[in-house]
Amino acid sequence: MLDHKGPPPVISGFTYLERLGAGGYSTVYLFEQHMPRREVAVKVMNADVEDKTASRFESEANLMARVSSHPAILSIYGAGVSADGHPFLVMEYCPPPQLGAILRQGPLNVAETLSTAIQIAGAVETAHRAGIVHRDIKPANILFTTYRRPVLSDFGISAMSGPEASEELRGMSVPWAPPEQLVGMRSANPASDIYSL
């Protein structure tokens, strides 16, 4: 198990810069990639690669790869396993603040609200067309690139809809969860994301 407050993992081809944050099953760090030289966000799973949650992490990588070419979805650059056996994702780095932090300072103006909403709605539509239900759309998961373009991030609890759907649904963010998830409904569908959006 990786101690997210301990030293960062050693990842070949990358230099550690700082810890960005930690969640339930992963920690996100800022690294500098050696080739090509750029700053990237590296999401490292806290559990070892043999742990059963490793498949959840692999699923997130594969789901993001299916849709990350959309301009309003966080780009994934690669994935691997660190020297100490922890799976990781290499992603586009979006400097703070994310939408949740911005909204705590006050509301966006009408033009910013419409622009952000339209772009994120396009990202959600793209995910749905690929058969992916995000399941965790909330202000904290809407980041802004260096050029102030909003991007949807964190596909960690996403699920497939339609024939590829899994019976196992994990987690939710209660304030943005649709009513059917709050009453224990086990299926994921696009309407859930629309409600959260």
Predicted regions and their residues:
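Conserved N-lobe loop of protein kinases adjacent to the ATP-binding glycine-rich P-loop
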Residues: 32-39
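Protein kinase catalytic-loop region centered on the HRD/HxD motif
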Residues: 122-132
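Activation segment signature within eukaryotic-like protein kinase domains
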Residues: 116-117
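Protein kinase glycine-rich loop
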Residues: 17-23, 28
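AlphaC helix of the eukaryotic protein kinase fold
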Residues: 46-67
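Short beta-strand micro-motifs within the conserved protein kinase catalytic domain, predominantly
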Residues: 75-87
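Conserved short submotifs of the Hanks-type protein kinase catalytic core
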Residues: 84-98, 102
